[in-house]
């Protein structure tokens, strides 16, 4: 999940929260690097990075099976919405959309708000990512109706499954779950909706987690399916890259 080692502090703007930031390498990468080595696994760790005094990022670090740092990604799209005041804390990423090479494949690691932007997923895929991974912190406001909750959750799942389809890649999205109060008391807090999931390269759901409790699961993902799916649905072959120049503009009218 996004910012794994504490509450989602971005519900308020509070300068004391900068004390939570840590360097990379730092305490978390040392602790979880040792765990990755002990278990022989690759870990994706979402952190509040202190790059320098007054300069902070929302960063995902990938730890190799031997405990070393394989690479990191700094969140590019930074929201500033009610209860998600991330621009107060985080500088936009400057590492681009670069997959991270690991012993289990090339990982296209993105973070939360990035998941709403198809361009981010596409650039990761174009640079050879073999799967997309999204540590996430997203949920409902206390005033949301059930209909609004259903719409938001449905949109969140749909767009990420769409990234899987459009790019012929598996997608893994890991979200927070449970209620976290607003420290300022101005709102009823956020009910993080969980529903972490994994989808295959045609958007098929491989597993869906509950919305109200944490679980650990082992899911088998066949990376070779991406090759077959891209042969059937050759979206990369048929892209009209000569006509896409407008995508680098903010708006066209």
Regions found by a protein language model. Give the residues of each.
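Cysteine/selenocysteine-centered motifs that mediate thiol-based redox chemistry or coordinate metal-sulfur cofactors
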Residues: 97-127, 136, 226-253
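A short, polar/charged loop-to-alpha-helix boundary motif
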Residues: 75-89, 213-230
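Short glycine/proline- and charge-enriched loop/turn segments
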Residues: 11-19, 81-82, 142-143, 147
